Amino acid sequence: MEVVEVLHMNGGNGDSSYANNSLVQQKVILMTKPITEQAMIDLYSSLFPETLCIADLGCSLGANTFLVVSQIVKIVEKERKKHGFKSPEFYFHFNDLPGNDFNTLFQSLGAFQEDLRKHIGESFGPCFFSGVPGSFYTRLFPSKSLHFVYSSYSLMWLSQVPNGIENNKGNIYMARTSPLSVIKAYYKQYEIDFSNFLKYRSEELMKGGKMVLTLLGRESEDPTSKECCYIWELLAMALNELVKEGLIKEEKVDAFNIPQYTPSPAEVKYLVEKEGSFTINRLETSRVHWNASNNVKNGGYNVSRCMRAVAEPLLVSHFDKELMDLVFHKYEEIISDCMSKEKTEFINVIVSLTKIN
């Protein structure tokens, strides 16, 4: 499985689309707003750029993508008015892997711009937008061309399934039953990928440029702790139930692994300091409930829909597409049972960085 070819959120605007099932991600963006706001204020008041070049890495599609744009424009407009300056030109780069539904994203752009003008008037900008398909574990932009890099709920995804994890039988991710070699392989791939991310962004950001990165993570130093692995353990349970029913071959489940690593703040800090191009302004964690909806009764349904929007393309690349309704129905039942018995939360790691030179 080539991750770069199959990793993307469900496109379009259907029942299983990411656009209609990304409330958790929206809440996380709103929770992170004060950190984004401070980074943008510090950036603008130190550089006063006439053109602001901003990259949203792992932008996906839907309202959340434009929520980030709206936040940034409003922050800068408020700040530049304080100083009595003319509004800068905004240049937003939307980056994601080639399988992302860029068409749906850009079809919504006109309506978003019109709505933004209604809220803050005609005096800002102009704003320019471009789509940049490609992996953020490679170079994406010219040297020293960016002022600000934003990424939310993307950097936990790895560039590939780690090598040497063939013995992770019965699991689809790191779990307490995973051999130590599997845990080490996952961390090694994360270390390679995040180090490359920092290296390439250090080349693309100008001196004094900022990054605000939010990713699924963990507070524990145990990479197999429930706070980061449980959601995938439950999906593995659903798949293994279908194995027992004879609908999926056991070898198919054994050969499937999620290309993701959810780091602790200490792991993020270590790699940032090791790479050496950035200072850490803030590094913190937050929590968000699996069921971000106010509809508590349908919690299992809401969470399984959210996870389907995220994971279905990966699953379809390995299992029969016709099985997906059954897989996620099983998953919903398992999640509902789990949520009735225990507290279920995602842990977020947020880091704000400044480019040193």
Curated annotation (Swiss-Prot):
Mg(2+) binds at N168, D254, F256, N257. Benzoate binds at Q25, W157, Q260. One of its GO terms (biological process) is pollination. The keyword Coiled coil does not apply. S-adenosyl-L-homocysteine binds at Y18, C59, N64, D96, L97, S135, F136. It is an enzyme of class 2 (transferase). Pathway: Aromatic compound metabolism. The keyword Transmembrane helix does not apply. SUPFAM superfamilies: S-adenosyl-L-methionine-dependent methyltransferases (SSF53335). Its EC number is 2.1.1.273. Belongs to the methyltransferase superfamily. Type-7 methyltransferase family. This is S-adenosyl-L-methionine:benzoic acid/salicylic acid carboxyl methyltransferase 3.
